[in-house]
């Protein structure tokens, strides 16, 4: 619980930079030191872009924001960077919604859609941990984020001012401390407190900080803090004594009572002006609607210090003038930080598009009396604001976009040679006629030599149909689509990497950045259908998924050689020639990238978040003697079956006590373990 202020990165890796990496590291580091605002790293798949950037980070020793365009890749980057920097603060900041339906109004149908959401508690904890690390004074902080980082947050100054600082032996009134906790949105739970909750037992307060997994025990003696101890909330095991403790707010929108009163007065004034305008235009329905909703929110703020949708009043709470950019995660970084934009050809356009969609939806809400005009200032950054805020940027992509190339002055740092000596996979064009039978035969060949395959279709329906066809043909197959939750996507990728499935079918979910060295075959159906998913950049990205395997091979099913296909063939030939020449000059024999099961589990570790939450919720963890299905591979058959019997007894007991959700969970665990044990036996 102590506040660390280490300022040095410690890069941990058994490897040394090789191939093009030393030259790229030197160029990027020098560019930052020379004050270059934008740089672009053009790195082919498997060239070690993450390792290269990790070396740059370690040499520059600055706080870093790493941006990715989706949660799956952010999770992978988070896992990899935690491996490279196990002794530093590597944090994770993505949207904490498992499901999110934004508030909206459809005038043509006169239909209001209320905001509906489901928050993932584990990701909320990781977000709070990220902001806590940034405000802790540490310099060795890496935050891996999606575009969530450009959306509004509470003020870092206000958030920092609310931090409760404790020290063993300090004077502190117990009741005053409890009131402070409640003002930081902590909730009392005297049974089994979880993240953001506390319990009181006489002069002892047990608290689970919102950004921590471990709990803090504060023992009072009169008006003095007698001791601070870190302990496991599940087992009660004391893990150590602390001299200091810092308790951060449980929510990211906080304001002290005085500022909240000022904000409420400003909201009242804006409401009065808006009501006068609506009534003068004879829009009485909108006026009544706005007054009812706003006064209800004000009453909630008065009584609780918080209301649902309080972020829509963030302009008043932070005291910003109308139209000023929102406060966001970038404001939590110190001045000397730098930004790394992964897969920049996708991430930068995504940042550019966020503002327009948000503005369009909220304008309708304001016009029809669902929100005050100030709600328009609860928004993501405009792209121009983002560019003004980022001090120095390194863009990473195998296929950089026009914007980053322009910003970098047309210069790129190239990573074409892989440390493993692997060449870009050969690309072959085959006719569409008979493509499914041909593809099935190709898949079976690659599975027979212990490899995996990715198959890309044009539509979700085609993916589903192809998935069903492969399953009937005896192929262990899964498909990814946009409705699968981010953490579940990571779990599916883990299944592919761990050998539970052999083929993944998808549309647009497997292109950028996925680290899948087991994949040796990439098949692209309808490759000659020119468009967003079949242009040069997309085809190069998809083909790159096979570039981490010595037997990598790409098949394009097409009847016409389009301009995009020809450019892919030409660029692949150019890169292969450079790579082959380098290997010959340095006596390098190409080899596949190999990762252990432990590395697979570590790099996809965020996918465990939901599972850990469920296990904690049902009291299934931690128990030293319990090893559930995710770890059954490490058991002897005798011990495995003994654990299954124990789980079966717990399942029956849970059913008898009508704890049906727990019983169903245990049933699924038993089934998974039996499958693993049967496979190994």
Swiss-Prot record:
GO terms for cellular component: cytoplasm; excinuclease repair complex. Residues 30-419 form the Helicase ATP-binding domain. InterPro entries: Helicase/UvrB_N, Helicase_ATP-bd, Helicase_C-like, P-loop_NTPase, UVR_dom, UVR_dom_sf, UvrB, UvrB_inter. Pfam families: Helicase_C (PF00271), ResIII (PF04851), UVR (PF02151), UvrB (PF12344), UvrB_inter (PF17757). This is UvrABC system protein B. Belongs to the UvrB family. Residues 641-676 form the UVR domain. It comes from Chlorobium chlorochromatii (strain CaD3). A motif (Beta-hairpin) lies at residues 96-119. Forms a heterotetramer with UvrA during the search for lesions. Interacts with UvrC in an incision complex.
